Amino acid sequence: MKRSEKSSTSVVSNNKQQDVNIISSNEVGVKEENKGHQEFLLKVLILSVIYVLAFSTRLFSVLRYESVIHEFDPYFNYRSTIYLVQEGFYNFLNWFDERAWYPLGRIVGGTIYPGLMATASLVHWSLNSLNITVNIRNVCVLLSPWFASNTAMVTYKFAKEVKDTQTGLVAAAMIAIVPGYISRSVAGSFDNEGIAIFALIFTYYCWIKSVNTGSLMWAAICSLAYFYMASAWGGYVFIINLIPLHAFFLLLTGRYSHRLYIAYSTMFVIGTILSMQITFISFQPVQSSEHLAAIGIFGLLQLYAGLSWVKSHLTNEAFKKLQRLTVLFVLSCAAAVLVVGTLTGYISPFNGRFYSLLDPTYARDHIPIIASVSEHQPTTWASYFFDLHILVFLFPAGLYFCFQKLTDANIFLILYGVTSIYFSGVMVRLMLVLAPVACILAAVAVSATLTTYMKKLKAPSSPSDANNSKESGGVMVAVLTVLLILYAFHCTWVTSEAYSSPSIVLSAKQNDGSRVIFDDFREAYRWIGQNTADDARIMSWWDYGYQLSAMANRTVLVDNNTWNNSHIAQVGKAFASTEEDAYIQMKALDVDYVLVIFGGLTGYSSDDINKFLWMVRIGGSCDPNIKEQDYLTNGQYRIDKGASPTMLNSLMYKLSYYRFSEVHTDYQRPTGFDRVRNVEIGNKNFDLTYLEEAFTSVHWLVRVYKVKDFDNRA
């Protein structure tokens, strides 16, 4: 009886214990579920804040000035978007612009990447379809900030795929405000790069996803992302070379897999076919030297996969013999195709900009028109810190953590980082390509460091070194926190002061901190549009061609497309010649008005006098009589009394300094004192014979001259 009572008691106690265990396990499950919900909500909140931050931090220019298009190239994009919205896509692709490159004109549809215009017009159409009436200008102004927010989200997914969620959140926060990317994505910067960086990161994310999963769907999405990138920016060549490089390194390191084969073969075939639908690209993916690496890696993967299959059906000796013969045959065929294609002209050589990336001195020595563009200059060390701040130091740390654990994704990140750091050093414009990977690698370093030291703060290894661990962990976390706060302050300051000023509206700060606005450009363009004939031809340096076409709606001789070097050289030659010789050239080109930018009164350093030597160099590339040495004095570029006679009598000098001797720029200086060059001009007393002043803006920034008609007696 007692035994039965004991046994029943033990059964009851066991049941109670099981119930307690079930309850405790359920409680643990509920807690974990609640924790998962909390983490999800926190992640959504952080990403929402980042999304809003990425958009709002780019609105300084709109708040400070107004909704206005920035820089030079965006004005052509804006004008083209208006044409696309009004005329439709078919007419846009067949648009011949008779107001550009007089008397040649320009076939627009076949000479541009239409992705930006198509995106803006699609957004405009979508909003108006929803009865949200929005002006196309506002769509163009705000498109880049919106895509910057989308880029932050894609960067989160990319970094998460490479490492983990924490890294993704840090990377998204960093790229939301990094100056290197903001420089091309502020409100009003309606340029190709504004949407292209989103397409770039999205393509890379889809590529890593397809390599990790071997999914045909992700490879197809990667192809679509690549197609969008190809439609938006010429930087798509970076993608179609980096992805093959990644595949090649995976082969070299013995990481070949069916996942890689599926991802690359699908992406290359579909992506190439789609990119060839862009009129400007056409057959370049199968003809140009820039795409040969992608074709070669595609063939190499097919060969490797085929040999791997054959190997399972042959003996080792037979396979080695077949392998040698196959490799020899393929190399011979590839060399023959390369030689024949190059000799027959089927395979086109590298273009000038691509050569400049491989050889930084190439453009300077052979193509001055490329070297004259400021964004094509090599990057200084100061620019790296200015555009990246602490990312400069976290970048190598991120590479170190990637090397510690080599995966397919980490190898891609390493290759992306190393190649982009090289190209950004060659051309300052490509800082834009470096900024995203710098943020991701910095996020890898920050995330790994914080994870390590936060563990020390929470759980010391033993009581003996608990204090040391907590102290070192606390110091490291505090240092990183301070650095990230400084990064945020620096990014905000750079965005506000350096990258939120439209070139068409200038401003300066007075001693009391208030701003003075110089709206001379729009004033001049409005005057030209209202006071000149509709068919008037305007000659200016190519920098201002797009703005003249969009703002004044007048015909220009050259513009920022710079597709015809000899035509630009004719304009450069005219500005470098004497007034009499230039008059003959201008009449031959049917020029009605000449526009020059002059900053001597206001201190605007980006005026035509400072650009004049580039006009001389480019003009001299087509006329050997134009020599740079003739415009220098003992190797120095001067505009004072010590300037060379050739310089003092050039058309550019006379148009810039005409009547400047009547102006006092400073009470302590003589008349005709140039505030940019900080000298008194050398030639004051001269008149114009063949041109007459038509308009000078309030601050003398823009000067317009009318070309006189021929004297009948002549």
From Swiss-Prot:
Motif WWDYG motif in this chain: 541-545
UniProt KW keywords: Endoplasmic reticulum, Glycoprotein, Glycosyltransferase, Magnesium, Manganese, Membrane, Metal-binding, Transferase, Transmembrane, Transmembrane helix
Sequence motif DXD motif 2, location on chain: 191-193
Region spans: Interacts with target acceptor peptide in protein substrate: 541-543
Positions occupied by motif DK motif: 608-615
Span of the annotated motif SVSE motif: 372-375
Enzyme's top EC category: transferase
Residues annotated for Mn(2+) binding in this entry: D73, D191, E193
GO process terms (BP): protein N-linked glycosylation
Stretches that traverse the bilayer: 40-60, 144-162, 165-182, 194-213, 216-230, 236-252, 258-283, 292-311, 327-347, 381-403, 410-426, 431-452, 467-489
Lumenal side of membrane: 61-143, 183-193, 231-235, 284-291, 348-380, 427-430, 490-714
Enzyme Commission number(s) of this protein: 2.4.99.18
Membrane topology: Multi-pass membrane protein
Any one GO CC term of the record: oligosaccharyltransferase complex
Main location as per UniProt: endoplasmic reticulum
Domain comment in the entry: Despite low primary sequence conservation between eukaryotic catalytic subunits and bacterial and archaeal single subunit OSTs (ssOST), structural comparison revealed several common motifs at spatially equivalent positions, like the DXD motif 1 on the external loop 1 and the DXD motif 2 on the external loop 2 involved in binding of the metal ion cofactor and the carboxamide group of the acceptor asparagine, the conserved Glu residue of the TIXE/SVSE motif on the external loop 5 involved in catalysis, as well as the WWDYG and the DK/MI motifs in the globular domain that define the binding pocket for the +2 Ser/Thr of the acceptor sequon.
Similarity remark: Belongs to the STT3 family.
Assembly notes: Component of the oligosaccharyltransferase (OST) complex.
Protein known as: Dolichyl-diphosphooligosaccharide--protein glycosyltransferase subunit STT3
Organism of derivation: Dictyostelium discoideum
